[in-house]
């Protein structure tokens, strides 16, 4: 575990006990102290993680309650929408029936109109023939004036017939006009009905869009609440990180302050020495002045002494320059030490940031592992409930068996077990189940005797399963069952596919019979895969039989741990939760 090591503060000069310790011993003591501090911090982290888990569980309960409320509201809206949709469908059906009746009547009117047209054409042809005859009679009249008396009678009769025909033509024209008027009225009614039908369709589409917008708004509000919860947790993490960095900054500021005080003490002591030297130099200079004042009278005799004093003054000046150089070097060293300390502080900050990143990654891994463990626990509990086993630490059914005759007794405890008393070494068969699903359909159960396979729709929507295929594999053999094109598995419904010799009567849609297969088959390793109409795997379940030799309680417990590990490996890697069957 990487940890930031703070620079050691200098030990007091007078500590004899510390001087007696070796550097190795000092390093061990420092490491021990660092480990103690790290353990304390780890304990604080663990307590915080537990509190966060408690808060997370409370938030999950609140989210589940909110989802239930939203589900009830959505179900109410769904019922209201379905009622309105049923009314609209009923109205549409009535309109369709009326339209069919009108179409039938229109067909009859068209047939009558065609008959009238044919009769009119016939009468028109007769009129043309009569006119021809009239012209012939007139020609005959002109040609034969002698036959006028006899022809007048024929003429009157022909004229009367002509009048009758004209009256019939007028009546037919009136009937044709009435038929045309009725046709126009029926056409207007048809257009009106079509417009009403179109308006009803548009109203239905509008209601559907409103319903979808309400669903999207509800989902958006739900996602907004989840984002607000995640942002609150992020703020809390940032606050904790700021507090930790603040504590580290205060510690290093204290250490830098200690270094600064030591350097100031050293600088003060050296400055005091220089000041004392300067005072001594001042005293000497005063003495020299007095001597010079006294030696004015003795210039000739004391010139050599003045030269010596000048040499001493130059020596003191050199000493002052040397001390100034030393002071500048000390200042430079102090700047270097400060720069080194700042670099170490930056490195420690980077290390702390890396540690926090590692901690967040470990926390994410821990959450994923907790979800996986919860999923495995739920899966094992469901298997124990299905097999009517009492809760235990592992999902295993142990059956002891031997080849010789023996007495069998059943005991009750945390785990149901059938013990076989015999003198020989006994063997146990462990049955482990693993399942996963990526869609709405999951494989709930595989009968170990090969009688049935049970599926369940875990979603709140109906699932069409036309063209879906279920494949059973036992070793190198396989068999496939394909659903009909119209089969639909209702929301929350369970369907059982029975073998032909299971002795069960078909009861669609919950119980189906595979007439072409007498048994689903039995074996040590049974695997069932469910594929959709595109050939994509949406669910799978496997049952593994493992035979072990029971030679003692300790070996039995080790076998249980190995079986649990096999179950975990069959479920999928914990680092890939999307491939496992998460039971919420």
Curated annotation (Swiss-Prot):
Superkingdom per UniProt: Eukaryota
Coiled coil: none
Region (Coil 1B): 81-218
Region (Coil 1A) location: 34-70
One Pfam match: Filament
UniProt xrefs under SMART domains: Filament
Keywords of this entry: Coiled coil, Intermediate filament, Lipoprotein, Methylation, Nucleus, Phosphoprotein, Prenylation
Compartments it resides in: Nucleus lamina; Nucleus envelope; Nucleus, Nucleoplasm; Nucleus matrix
Major location (coarse): nucleus
InterPro entries linked to this entry: IF_conserved (IPR018039), IF_rod_dom (IPR039008), Lamin_tail_dom (IPR001322), Lamin_tail_dom_sf (IPR036415)
Propeptide residue intervals: 582-584
Renumbered ranges of motif Nuclear localization signal: 414-419
Cysteine methyl ester PTM sites in chain numbering: 581
Domain LTD residue range list: 429-545
UniProt GO cellular component terms: intermediate filament; nuclear envelope; nuclear lamina; nuclear matrix; nucleoplasm
Chain intervals for the UniProt region annotation (Tail): 386-584
Segments for region (Coil 2): 243-385
Segments of this protein annotated with the region Disordered: 1-22, 388-431, 548-584
IF rod domain location: 31-387
Protein function: Lamins are intermediate filament proteins that assemble into a filamentous meshwork, and which constitute the major components of the nuclear lamina, a fibrous layer on the nucleoplasmic side of the inner nuclear membrane. Lamins provide a framework for the nuclear envelope, bridging the nuclear envelope and chromatin. Plays an important role in nuclear assembly, chromatin organization, nuclear membrane and telomere dynamics.
Similarity remark: Belongs to the intermediate filament family.
Subunit and partners: Homodimer. Lamin dimers then assemble into dimeric head-to-tail polymers. Ultimately, two head-to-tail polymers assemble laterally into a protofilament with a uniformly shaped rod of 3.5 nm in diameter.
Protein name: Lamin-B1
Organism expressing this protein natively: Gallus gallus (Chicken)
